[in-house]
Protein backbone atom coordinates (compact mmCIF):
# COMPACT_ATOMS: atom_id res chain seq x y z
CA UNK A 1 0.00 0.00 0.00
CA UNK A 2 1.55 3.29 -1.12
CA UNK A 3 1.09 6.62 0.64
CA UNK A 4 1.79 10.03 -0.81
CA UNK A 5 5.00 11.47 0.54
CA UNK A 6 4.52 14.51 2.76
CA UNK A 7 6.80 16.76 4.81
CA UNK A 8 6.67 16.07 8.53
CA UNK A 9 8.00 19.25 10.21
CA UNK A 10 9.23 17.48 13.34
CA UNK A 11 11.56 15.28 11.28
CA UNK A 12 12.98 17.83 8.82
CA UNK A 13 16.37 18.06 10.55
CA UNK A 14 16.81 14.29 10.45
CA UNK A 15 15.96 14.22 6.76
CA UNK A 16 18.31 17.14 6.10
CA UNK A 17 21.11 15.26 7.86
CA UNK A 18 20.39 12.11 5.84
CA UNK A 19 20.53 14.07 2.59
CA UNK A 20 23.75 15.87 3.48
CA UNK A 21 25.42 12.64 4.54
CA UNK A 22 24.29 10.97 1.32
CA UNK A 23 25.74 13.75 -0.84
CA UNK A 24 29.05 13.58 1.04
CA UNK A 25 29.16 9.77 0.99
CA UNK A 26 28.60 9.25 -2.73
CA UNK A 27 30.91 12.14 -3.60
CA UNK A 28 33.66 10.63 -1.44
CA UNK A 29 33.20 7.24 -3.10
CA UNK A 30 33.30 8.82 -6.56
CA UNK A 31 36.56 10.62 -5.75
CA UNK A 32 38.06 7.45 -4.24
CA UNK A 33 37.30 5.42 -7.37
CA UNK A 34 38.45 8.23 -9.69
CA UNK A 35 41.73 8.37 -7.80
CA UNK A 36 42.34 4.67 -8.53
CA UNK A 37 41.61 4.50 -12.25
CA UNK A 38 44.29 5.39 -14.75
CA UNK A 39 42.86 7.33 -17.69
CA UNK A 40 41.37 10.79 -17.65
CA UNK A 41 38.21 9.58 -19.39
CA UNK A 42 37.76 6.84 -16.78
CA UNK A 43 38.18 9.39 -13.99
CA UNK A 44 35.50 11.55 -15.60
CA UNK A 45 33.16 8.57 -15.81
CA UNK A 46 33.73 7.79 -12.14
CA UNK A 47 32.84 11.30 -10.94
CA UNK A 48 29.72 11.31 -13.13
CA UNK A 49 28.32 7.78 -12.85
CA UNK A 50 28.87 7.05 -9.15
CA UNK A 51 27.20 10.24 -7.83
CA UNK A 52 24.39 9.71 -10.37
CA UNK A 53 24.00 6.18 -8.98
CA UNK A 54 23.59 7.57 -5.46
CA UNK A 55 21.42 10.55 -6.38
CA UNK A 56 18.80 8.72 -8.48
CA UNK A 57 15.54 7.49 -6.84
CA UNK A 58 16.69 3.93 -6.01
CA UNK A 59 19.01 5.41 -3.37
CA UNK A 60 17.99 9.06 -2.99
CA UNK A 61 14.31 8.41 -2.22
CA UNK A 62 15.32 6.74 1.04
CA UNK A 63 17.08 9.92 2.19
CA UNK A 64 13.71 11.57 2.77
CA UNK A 65 12.26 8.57 4.63
CA UNK A 66 12.81 7.80 8.30
CA UNK A 67 14.36 4.36 8.32
CA UNK A 68 17.69 2.59 8.44
CA UNK A 69 18.11 2.47 4.65
CA UNK A 70 19.51 5.98 4.15
CA UNK A 71 22.23 5.59 6.77
CA UNK A 72 22.96 2.08 5.54
CA UNK A 73 23.58 3.23 1.98
CA UNK A 74 25.57 6.33 2.96
CA UNK A 75 27.80 4.61 5.50
CA UNK A 76 28.33 1.74 3.06
CA UNK A 77 29.55 4.20 0.40
CA UNK A 78 31.93 5.85 2.89
CA UNK A 79 33.17 2.48 4.17
CA UNK A 80 33.76 1.25 0.63
CA UNK A 81 35.73 4.39 -0.24
CA UNK A 82 37.94 3.96 2.82
CA UNK A 83 38.41 0.22 2.25
CA UNK A 84 39.45 1.01 -1.31
CA UNK A 85 42.16 3.27 0.08
CA UNK A 86 43.23 0.62 2.61
CA UNK A 87 43.43 -2.09 -0.07
CA UNK A 88 45.60 -0.04 -2.41
CA UNK A 89 47.79 1.14 0.45
CA UNK A 90 48.38 -2.47 1.49
CA UNK A 91 48.96 -3.59 -2.11
CA UNK A 92 51.57 -0.89 -2.68
CA UNK A 93 53.23 -1.73 0.66
CA UNK A 94 53.25 1.90 1.77
CA UNK A 95 54.92 2.48 5.13
CA UNK A 96 52.92 3.32 8.22
CA UNK A 97 52.65 6.93 9.35
CA UNK A 98 50.28 9.58 10.63
CA UNK A 99 48.15 9.24 7.48
CA UNK A 100 47.87 5.49 8.08
CA UNK A 101 46.71 6.06 11.65
CA UNK A 102 44.06 8.51 10.46
CA UNK A 103 42.94 6.15 7.68
CA UNK A 104 42.72 3.23 10.11
CA UNK A 105 40.65 5.26 12.56
CA UNK A 106 38.26 6.57 9.91
CA UNK A 107 37.82 3.13 8.36
CA UNK A 108 37.02 1.45 11.66
CA UNK A 109 34.63 4.24 12.66
CA UNK A 110 32.74 4.01 9.37
CA UNK A 111 32.57 0.20 9.49
CA UNK A 112 31.45 0.23 13.13
CA UNK A 113 28.62 2.69 12.44
CA UNK A 114 27.59 0.86 9.27
CA UNK A 115 27.51 -2.51 11.02
CA UNK A 116 24.86 -1.45 13.50
CA UNK A 117 22.48 0.17 11.01
CA UNK A 118 21.17 -3.28 10.05
CA UNK A 119 21.79 -6.66 11.68
CA UNK A 120 22.66 -8.38 8.39
CA UNK A 121 25.63 -6.03 7.90
CA UNK A 122 27.37 -7.99 10.65
CA UNK A 123 27.90 -10.87 8.23
CA UNK A 124 29.69 -8.62 5.76
CA UNK A 125 32.04 -7.58 8.56
CA UNK A 126 32.59 -11.23 9.51
CA UNK A 127 33.46 -12.06 5.91
CA UNK A 128 35.80 -9.06 5.79
CA UNK A 129 37.60 -10.42 8.86
CA UNK A 130 37.93 -13.86 7.25
CA UNK A 131 39.28 -12.26 4.07
CA UNK A 132 41.82 -10.36 6.15
CA UNK A 133 43.04 -13.60 7.76
CA UNK A 134 43.30 -15.28 4.35
CA UNK A 135 45.25 -12.28 3.05
CA UNK A 136 47.74 -12.54 5.92
CA UNK A 137 48.28 -16.19 4.97
CA UNK A 138 48.63 -15.57 1.22
CA UNK A 139 50.63 -12.32 1.29
CA UNK A 140 53.37 -12.59 3.95
CA UNK A 141 54.62 -9.04 3.33
CA UNK A 142 51.45 -7.47 4.78
CA UNK A 143 51.72 -9.35 8.08
CA UNK A 144 53.80 -6.52 9.54
CA UNK A 145 51.31 -3.85 8.50
CA UNK A 146 50.17 -2.49 11.86
CA UNK A 147 47.15 -0.76 10.39
CA UNK A 148 45.83 -4.00 8.89
CA UNK A 149 46.47 -5.89 12.12
CA UNK A 150 44.51 -3.30 14.10
CA UNK A 151 41.67 -3.28 11.57
CA UNK A 152 41.46 -7.08 11.57
CA UNK A 153 41.40 -7.26 15.36
CA UNK A 154 38.68 -4.63 15.65
CA UNK A 155 36.67 -6.36 12.91
CA UNK A 156 36.61 -9.50 15.06
CA UNK A 157 35.43 -7.47 18.06
CA UNK A 158 32.73 -5.75 15.98
CA UNK A 159 31.54 -9.13 14.68
CA UNK A 160 31.24 -10.59 18.18
CA UNK A 161 29.49 -7.49 19.54
CA UNK A 162 27.17 -7.34 16.55
CA UNK A 163 26.10 -10.97 16.74
CA UNK A 164 25.60 -10.72 20.49
CA UNK A 165 23.57 -7.53 20.09
CA UNK A 166 21.39 -9.03 17.36
CA UNK A 167 20.58 -12.11 19.41
CA UNK A 168 20.01 -10.32 22.71
CA UNK A 169 17.80 -7.63 21.18
CA UNK A 170 15.36 -10.24 19.82
CA UNK A 171 14.87 -8.15 16.67
CA UNK A 172 14.74 -11.46 14.82
CA UNK A 173 11.68 -12.67 16.73
CA UNK A 174 8.93 -11.01 14.67
CA UNK A 175 10.47 -11.83 11.24
CA UNK A 176 11.11 -15.44 12.26
CA UNK A 177 7.56 -15.70 13.58
CA UNK A 178 6.40 -14.73 10.09
CA UNK A 179 8.66 -17.39 8.57
CA UNK A 180 7.37 -20.15 10.84
CA UNK A 181 3.76 -19.10 10.24
CA UNK A 182 4.11 -19.13 6.44
CA UNK A 183 6.86 -21.61 5.57
CA UNK A 184 7.09 -24.14 8.42
CA UNK A 185 3.91 -24.72 10.42
CA UNK A 186 1.46 -25.08 7.48
CA UNK A 187 3.50 -28.03 6.14
CA UNK A 188 3.28 -31.27 8.20
CA UNK A 189 6.66 -32.62 7.09
CA UNK A 190 8.46 -29.39 7.99
CA UNK A 191 6.61 -29.14 11.30
CA UNK A 192 7.58 -32.74 12.04
CA UNK A 193 11.23 -31.87 11.44
CA UNK A 194 10.98 -29.06 13.98
CA UNK A 195 9.24 -31.35 16.46
CA UNK A 196 12.22 -33.66 16.09
CA UNK A 197 14.39 -30.75 17.21
CA UNK A 198 12.32 -30.35 20.35
CA UNK A 199 9.63 -27.92 19.23
CA UNK A 200 6.51 -28.31 21.41
CA UNK A 201 2.96 -27.88 20.17
CA UNK A 202 2.40 -24.29 19.10
CA UNK A 203 -0.53 -24.01 21.50
CA UNK A 204 1.47 -25.27 24.46
CA UNK A 205 2.71 -22.88 27.13
CA UNK A 206 6.28 -24.05 26.47
CA UNK A 207 6.24 -22.97 22.81
CA UNK A 208 7.11 -19.26 23.34
CA UNK A 209 10.01 -20.25 25.58
CA UNK A 210 11.29 -22.79 23.04
CA UNK A 211 10.91 -20.29 20.21
CA UNK A 212 12.85 -17.62 22.08
CA UNK A 213 15.73 -19.93 22.90
CA UNK A 214 15.90 -22.26 19.90
CA UNK A 215 14.07 -20.94 16.83
CA UNK A 216 17.04 -19.35 14.98
CA UNK A 217 19.22 -22.41 15.47
CA UNK A 218 16.42 -24.82 14.54
CA UNK A 219 15.54 -22.87 11.40
CA UNK A 220 19.19 -22.80 10.33
CA UNK A 221 19.38 -26.58 10.79
CA UNK A 222 16.22 -26.97 8.73
CA UNK A 223 17.70 -24.99 5.82
CA UNK A 224 20.97 -26.93 5.96
CA UNK A 225 19.16 -30.28 6.16
CA UNK A 226 17.02 -29.43 3.12
CA UNK A 227 19.45 -28.02 0.53
CA UNK A 228 17.03 -28.66 -2.33
CA UNK A 229 14.34 -26.53 -0.71
CA UNK A 230 16.85 -23.86 0.25
CA UNK A 231 18.37 -23.63 -3.23
CA UNK A 232 15.15 -23.70 -5.24
CA UNK A 233 13.35 -21.27 -2.92
CA UNK A 234 16.14 -18.74 -3.29
CA UNK A 235 16.87 -19.08 -7.01
CA UNK A 236 13.21 -19.12 -8.03
CA UNK A 237 12.76 -15.75 -6.34
CA UNK A 238 15.85 -14.00 -7.72
CA UNK A 239 13.76 -12.24 -10.33
CA UNK A 240 11.53 -10.80 -7.64
CA UNK A 241 14.47 -9.80 -5.45
CA UNK A 242 15.99 -7.73 -8.28
CA UNK A 243 12.64 -6.43 -9.56
CA UNK A 244 12.51 -3.30 -7.39
CA UNK A 245 14.65 -0.25 -8.08
CA UNK A 246 12.45 2.39 -6.44
CA UNK A 247 11.14 2.30 -2.87
CA UNK A 248 7.54 1.03 -2.96
CA UNK A 249 6.12 2.66 0.16
CA UNK A 250 5.59 6.30 -0.84
CA UNK A 251 4.92 7.87 -4.21
CA UNK A 252 5.92 11.29 -5.53
CA UNK A 253 4.28 13.67 -7.96
CA UNK A 254 5.20 12.60 -11.50
CA UNK A 255 6.77 15.83 -12.70
CA UNK A 256 8.98 16.04 -15.79
CA UNK A 257 12.09 16.07 -13.61
CA UNK A 258 10.87 13.04 -11.66
CA UNK A 259 10.17 11.11 -14.86
CA UNK A 260 13.64 11.95 -16.18
CA UNK A 261 15.24 10.77 -12.94
CA UNK A 262 13.24 7.53 -13.02
CA UNK A 263 14.37 6.89 -16.61
CA UNK A 264 18.01 7.44 -15.59
CA UNK A 265 17.39 5.31 -12.52
CA UNK A 266 16.28 2.38 -14.68
CA UNK A 267 19.59 2.56 -16.56
CA UNK A 268 21.84 2.83 -13.50
CA UNK A 269 19.85 0.36 -11.38
CA UNK A 270 18.81 -2.42 -13.79
CA UNK A 271 16.12 -4.64 -12.30
CA UNK A 272 17.50 -7.94 -13.53
CA UNK A 273 19.52 -10.59 -11.72
CA UNK A 274 21.82 -10.79 -14.76
CA UNK A 275 23.73 -8.02 -12.98
CA UNK A 276 25.01 -10.72 -10.63
CA UNK A 277 26.29 -12.78 -13.58
CA UNK A 278 27.97 -9.75 -15.16
CA UNK A 279 29.70 -8.93 -11.86
CA UNK A 280 31.08 -12.45 -11.67
CA UNK A 281 32.40 -12.24 -15.22
CA UNK A 282 34.03 -8.87 -14.55
CA UNK A 283 35.77 -10.14 -11.41
CA UNK A 284 36.92 -13.31 -13.16
CA UNK A 285 38.38 -11.19 -15.96
CA UNK A 286 40.17 -8.95 -13.47
CA UNK A 287 41.45 -11.98 -11.56
CA UNK A 288 42.89 -13.45 -14.75
CA UNK A 289 44.60 -10.15 -15.58
CA UNK A 290 45.96 -9.79 -12.05
CA UNK A 291 47.36 -13.33 -12.15
CA UNK A 292 48.98 -13.01 -15.57
CA UNK A 293 50.31 -9.46 -15.17
CA UNK A 294 51.31 -9.67 -11.49
CA UNK A 295 49.86 -6.20 -10.99
CA UNK A 296 49.33 -5.14 -7.36
CA UNK A 297 46.61 -2.61 -8.23
CA UNK A 298 44.61 -5.26 -10.08
CA UNK A 299 45.07 -7.59 -7.11
CA UNK A 300 43.58 -4.93 -4.83
CA UNK A 301 40.57 -4.52 -7.14
CA UNK A 302 40.05 -8.28 -7.26
CA UNK A 303 40.27 -8.58 -3.47
CA UNK A 304 37.70 -5.85 -3.00
CA UNK A 305 35.44 -7.27 -5.71
CA UNK A 306 35.47 -10.80 -4.30
CA UNK A 307 34.65 -9.46 -0.83
CA UNK A 308 31.76 -7.42 -2.22
CA UNK A 309 30.32 -10.39 -4.10
CA UNK A 310 30.72 -12.74 -1.13
CA UNK A 311 29.24 -10.24 1.33
CA UNK A 312 26.33 -9.23 -0.89
CA UNK A 313 25.49 -12.86 -1.64
CA UNK A 314 25.54 -13.90 2.02
CA UNK A 315 23.49 -10.87 3.07
CA UNK A 316 20.96 -11.50 0.30
CA UNK A 317 20.53 -15.16 1.24
CA UNK A 318 20.24 -14.43 4.97
CA UNK A 319 17.78 -11.57 4.47
CA UNK A 320 15.73 -13.63 2.02
CA UNK A 321 15.21 -16.47 4.49
CA UNK A 322 14.99 -14.25 7.58
CA UNK A 323 11.48 -12.96 6.87
CA UNK A 324 8.51 -13.69 4.65
CA UNK A 325 7.38 -10.06 4.47
CA UNK A 326 9.16 -7.17 2.75
CA UNK A 327 11.86 -9.36 1.22
CA UNK A 328 12.80 -6.83 -1.48
CA UNK A 329 13.41 -4.21 1.18
CA UNK A 330 15.47 -6.56 3.34
CA UNK A 331 17.66 -7.58 0.39
CA UNK A 332 17.97 -4.08 -1.04
CA UNK A 333 21.51 -3.32 0.15
CA UNK A 334 22.80 -6.56 -1.37
CA UNK A 335 21.01 -5.88 -4.66
CA UNK A 336 22.33 -2.32 -4.84
CA UNK A 337 25.83 -3.60 -4.08
CA UNK A 338 25.69 -5.81 -7.16
CA UNK A 339 24.38 -2.91 -9.24
CA UNK A 340 27.09 -0.57 -7.97
CA UNK A 341 29.78 -3.15 -8.68
CA UNK A 342 28.71 -3.29 -12.31
CA UNK A 343 29.55 0.38 -12.83
CA UNK A 344 32.63 0.55 -10.62
CA UNK A 345 34.31 -2.41 -12.29
CA UNK A 346 33.24 -1.41 -15.79
CA UNK A 347 34.95 1.95 -15.25
Residue ranges and their predicted role:
Residues 9-22, 237-308, 312-313:
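Membrane-interface anchor segments at the N-terminal boundary of transmembrane helices
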Residues 14-17, 51-83, 114-124, 325, ...:
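Multi-pass, polyprenyl lipid-linked donor-dependent membrane glycosyltransferases
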Residues 16-40, 78, 82:
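Transmembrane-helix motifs of polytopic, lipid-linked glycan transferases
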Residues 29-55, 73-74, 96-98:
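Transmembrane-helix signature of polytopic, membrane-embedded enzymes
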Residues 42-44, 96-104, 138-155:
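Membrane-interfacial entry segments at the cytosolic side of transmembrane helices
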Residues 71-91, 107-111, 128-129, 341:
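Specific aromatic-rich, kink-prone transmembrane helix
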Residues 102-118, 130, 155-160:
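Membrane-interface alpha helices of multi-pass inner-membrane proteins
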Residues 165-255:
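Membrane-proximal stem/loop segments at transmembrane-domain junctions that anchor or position
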Amino acid sequence: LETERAVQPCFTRIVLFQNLLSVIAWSVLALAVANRVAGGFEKLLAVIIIPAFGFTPAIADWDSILGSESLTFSLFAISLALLLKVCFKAASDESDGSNSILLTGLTLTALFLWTFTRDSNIYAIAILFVFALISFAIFPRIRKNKGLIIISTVLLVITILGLQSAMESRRWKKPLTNVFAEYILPFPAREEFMVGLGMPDTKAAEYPVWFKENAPRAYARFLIAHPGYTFTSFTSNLGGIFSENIQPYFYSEQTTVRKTLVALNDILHPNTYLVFVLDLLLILGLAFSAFTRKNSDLTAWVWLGVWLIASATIMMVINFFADSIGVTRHTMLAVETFRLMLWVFLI
